[in-house]
Amino acid sequence: MAMTELTGRIHSLESFGTVDGPGIRYVVFFQGCPMRCLYCHNPDTWEMAGGTEMTADEIIEKITRNREFYSSGGITATGGEPMLQIDFLTELFTKAKQNGIRTALDTCGILFDPDHTEKTDKLMAVTDLVLLDIKHMFDEEHKKLTGHSNARVFAFAEYLKKIGKPVWIRHVVVPGITFRREELLALGRYLKTLTNMEKLEVLPYHSMGKVKYDSLGIE
């Protein structure tokens, strides 16, 4: 009996991304996210029930049609939270690498389990760059902001440092929440310890996602 081909739930695809890693990126927005960040601009990616089922081959075929555009870039998995579908994500990145396409993962790191890294190890073997979102340095504030502790985020950051995986840190600046002196000083001190960090991206808060909240009936 033939094996069922692995599929992922994909929210959307962007063929000309310029802010999700180096060069021009083919950006895959994964469906589903365990966090509920108060400033999230993609609330329509939260629930796993949304999106469209796709195979890795279907996505790779779309990229390779115009692969010359991505010669200095590659594919970026974002979301939502791509690591929520880690098996499919690993298959997608494996096939991308087989086709000579560089890979980047945009993640909040919240699903990393330091006691069980087997699947993460396999994923990192086919991941060229990690874009790690640090939402807030202080745990209680992180819980208020996202609904979760930041312990696993920092555990993931330390794991990436240990394996020497290149990382770009991303931090959204929200006035009165993540743009306080003590929080920024703590962030700066921590980033100095990340020997694998290549870049810090400070992202301004925007309200472009408001229309999505209105259409979804989310306060």
Protein language model features and the residues they cover:
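N-terminal [4Fe-4S]-dependent radical SAM core
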Residues: 1-30, 34-52, 65-71
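Conserved AdoMet/S-adenosylmethionine-binding subsite of the radical SAM
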Residues: 64-74, 83-208
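Residues at secondary-structure transition points
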Residues: 19, 24, 49-50, 54, ...
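Short acidic donor-binding/metal-coordinating loop in glycosyltransferase active sites
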Residues: 79-80
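Short glycine/proline- and charge-enriched loop/turn segments
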Residues: 43, 214-219
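Class I S-adenosyl-L-methionine
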Residues: 207-215
